[in-house]
């Protein structure tokens, strides 16, 4: 599977097992993985330093943080992202509106499709 070949994808996930699984899914699809970032601070630094092509975020991070500030920065830089979460889409803050919500658990094919949908959504923005 090479659906993501050549793409550099930032992973923002504080759970080690989830991060490892996500990295494996992305690598098997041909992506180069950046991260994982476990905190907002790490994620913001990686966005500035690495300029990823796309990103996959978890909603809840370490120390009670959420990834909303990360989503805002990705939107400012026109970087498409997927919010992979167990939180219901209708209860998410508006800061995630530019991304695509993918409900956990999900299959690799659903992740790849969501990343494509995120790209289409971001490029369609005015």
Question: What is each stretch, according to the model?
Answer:
Residues 16-35:
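Two-component/phosphorelay signaling modules centered on CheY-like receiver
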Residues 84-85:
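Hydrophobic/aromatic residues positioned on beta-strands within the core alpha/beta folds
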Residues 48-50, 73-79, 90:
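Conserved phosphotransfer cores of two-component systems
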Residues 57-75:
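Conserved phosphotransfer microenvironments
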Residues 36-54:
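Acidic, metal-coordinating helix/loop segments flanking the phosphotransfer/catalytic sites
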Residues 1-8, 41, 107-126:
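Non-catalytic signal-transmission and effector/linker regions of two-component phosphorelay proteins
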Residues 13:
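Conserved acidic carboxylate
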Residues 104:
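A Lys-centered signature of the CheY-like receiver
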């Amino acid at each position: 599977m090479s659906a993501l070949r050549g793409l550099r994808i930032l992973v923002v996930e504080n759970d080690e097992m989830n991060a490892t699984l996500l990295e494996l899914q992305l690598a098997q699809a041909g992506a180069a993985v950046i991260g994982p970032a476990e905190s907002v601070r790490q994620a913001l630094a990686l966005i500035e330093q690495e300029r990823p092509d796309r990103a996959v975020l978890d909603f809840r991070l370490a120390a009670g943080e959420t990834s909303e500030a990360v989503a805002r920065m990705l939107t400012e830089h026109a970087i498409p992202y997927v919010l992979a979460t167990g939180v219901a889409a209708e209860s998410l803050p508006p800061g995630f509106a530019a991304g695509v919500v993918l409900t956990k658990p999900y299959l690799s094919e659903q992740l790849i499709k969501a990343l494509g949908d995120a790209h289409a959504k971001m490029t369609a923005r005015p």
